[in-house]
Amino acid sequence: KQTIQSAQNQAGGTGVQQTQDMTSIVSDIIVNTNTETGSKMIEEVNNSSTENNLSLQVISGISEKDTTKLNTLSENNKEQMDTLTESAVKNAGASQEDADLIATVVANANEDFANQIIGEVTKNSTEENQALSAKVMKSIVESNPDKIDSLSDENKDNMISQTIEAAKNQSEGNTNDDVDLTNTIAEIITKSNDETATKVLETLTDTLEESESKLALNVVSNLTKQENYE
């Protein structure tokens, strides 16, 4: 319990400055101990009511250290992992750093668990976090573009439409984000496989038929700047 409290304080930027990464220690314990101890640690993380990204850091740490353990936990400790996943995505900001952590878990998760995580992403990609889907998708196609193929059609369609909607709102001045989302779309198109890239372009075209946004022009402009664009 004290270990979790230290990790929570560190993730929230409070408490004594630790030289060690406490969330890494928590994920180490979960990965390297028996199921019962690991289960207790996850329970403690779930019970530590907090609005920082402790859950996300822990689940990302597990996925990087032991893919098999991650998927075993998602199957055998489903209720706990469901809570951990829900909390991890819900408390994630729309920063690229948090999106990268989510993408790391997706990359290492089996098909069912990956779809569950992306389902949470699309559920939480709203209001001030509207750009979350765009940033997670960008991170996935950068590191593991074929992973998109293992997602359900519903998850893929939701991610793509939310990505384009967020960029449209930004280009119309309705939202602020430190990242140019038209460039994010251009990067997704360039780095995705053909099927995903085509789907993004089709959705972009459909969206723009209903609006007078300069979004398409900005995306095309950014596409020409991409290294691998032909």
Where is each model-derived feature located?
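Non-catalytic all-alpha helical scaffold/repeat segments
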Residues: 1-230
